[in-house]
């Protein structure tokens, strides 16, 4: 069974997310644990957490298919001490929110070194992750591959491996693969050889069991453009045929697919339908 969903709004409460996920044709989801554009975050009440867990059970959503995504302001690679410290403290709070809700996975962008260099940036990320992981429990941090722009760290999977290898609690660090970001950074998933190379790289660097989520996004720009502009499924440069190649791999089918395509719930429902149309159109076998 394909595990698919989208990044869902929490404006009406965490407990609305499971129902809204089912309404768009999904069985998986990603949410922000708080207002993503704020340094402020608070734990949900006991009542809110209980209602959320009840709705998860009611709608049959597996906890392995539920994810949080860290806020936009966090930058563990920042050379600015105040931003780095605020990022660490907010990430700790996000981990606590995930634990309260029962969500096991928290996705983060590693961060931007802001021109100070990859090595220094990775050192700061590792120090930040150690501070977070050594003072929290349970939640697994997912390092997401990012676009090659603005001093970003993580546009190559080797950079994510460097980070994971250096943290104290490697068992609490896994990865997310974003199809737009990867395409933007030169990973061509529109060809069978490209997907095979990607899977081989993930296996050799992390082990495929460490790939916990796929951010399923088309790209507004061509391969290697380094623009980081998501597009709706089938409407960008990856396209229907490209996604058909990607979807045909069993290793890809085993991982939850989360849409971060333009639009809201209505558009995401259409994109989920498009995914299954591609699977049917190209005769892709699905377990």
Curated annotation (Swiss-Prot):
One of its GO terms (biological process) is base-excision repair. Zn(2+) 2 binds at residues 144, 178, 215, 260. PROSITE patterns: AP_NUCLEASE_F2_1, AP_NUCLEASE_F2_2, AP_NUCLEASE_F2_3, AP_NUCLEASE_F2_4. The keyword Cell division does not apply. Its cofactor is Zn(2+). Zn(2+) 1 binds at residues 69, 109, 144. Zn(2+) 3 binds at residues 181, 228, 230. Binds 3 Zn(2+) ions. Its EC number is 3.1.21.2. Keywords: DNA damage, DNA repair, Endonuclease, Hydrolase, Metal-binding, Nuclease, Zinc. It catalyses: Endonucleolytic cleavage to 5'-phosphooligonucleotide end-products. It is an enzyme of class 3 (hydrolase). One of its GO terms (molecular function) is DNA-(apurinic or apyrimidinic site) endonuclease activity. Belongs to the AP endonuclease 2 family. Endonuclease IV plays a role in DNA repair. It cleaves phosphodiester bonds at apurinic or apyrimidinic (AP) sites, generating a 3'-hydroxyl group and a 5'-terminal sugar phosphate. NCBIfam families: nfo. This is Probable endonuclease 4. The gene is nfo.
